[in-house]
Amino acid sequence: MYEKIFPNKRFKITMAFLQKHISKSESILDLGVENPFSKMMKTDGFEVRNTLGEDLDIDFSTLKNEKFEVVTAFEIFEHLLNPFTILNEIKADKILISVPLRLWFSEAYQSKTDPRDRHFHEFEDWQLDWLLEKTGWEIIDRIQFTNPVKKLGIRPLLRLFTPRYYLVYAVRK
């Protein structure tokens, strides 16, 4: 599921955003199984626990039964059928979310080898903002950034200047 070449630009921007808003003394629940970025957070001194691969559309008991100060969800919500329920169930006071933005020149992502690795939602920034607002979160900071790929073609050229990722820090109202 994870590439052998890590998305360094995306990871650097995400780590800087995390460091800007979250103290290393705060407990973090990172939605999704342990991954290269959650390992980077731990190496950087953050106290991180990941979910165990349960289907969060069906089993969100970790969110209901345990209290963390921060929940992070890096490229998770686009895979969920109902992110509204998850956002409602989170007991933390802070959340950091990143989602890939819907690109007008690219179809929704669907892995050809892993049936779990597909995007049910392709967000525009206003859609995630609205979802957060409706579930009781107040956005404090947000950024969009590009993630160019080193390939030839029209889509790689468009990715040089078209924002690809949306990163949001919000607090519970």
Enumerate the language-model features and the residues they cover:
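Short, glycine-/aromatic-enriched active-site segment of Class I SAM-dependent methyltransferases
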Residues: 97-121
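Short N-terminal helix/helix-N-cap motif within the alpha/beta-hydrolase-1
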Residues: 81-85, 107
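Short, glycine/acidic-enriched loop or turn micro-motifs at the edges of active sites
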Residues: 33, 78, 101
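Flexible loop residues that form catalytic
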Residues: 76, 100, 145-147
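Active-site flanking residues adjacent to catalytic metal/cofactor-binding acidic residues
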Residues: 29, 74, 97
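A short beta-strand submotif of the Rossmann-like class I SAM-dependent methyltransferase core
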Residues: 70-76
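A structural motif corresponding to the C-terminal end of an alpha-helix
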Residues: 131-137
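Conserved N-terminal segment of class I S-adenosyl-L-methionine
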Residues: 1-70, 84-93, 115-130, 141-173
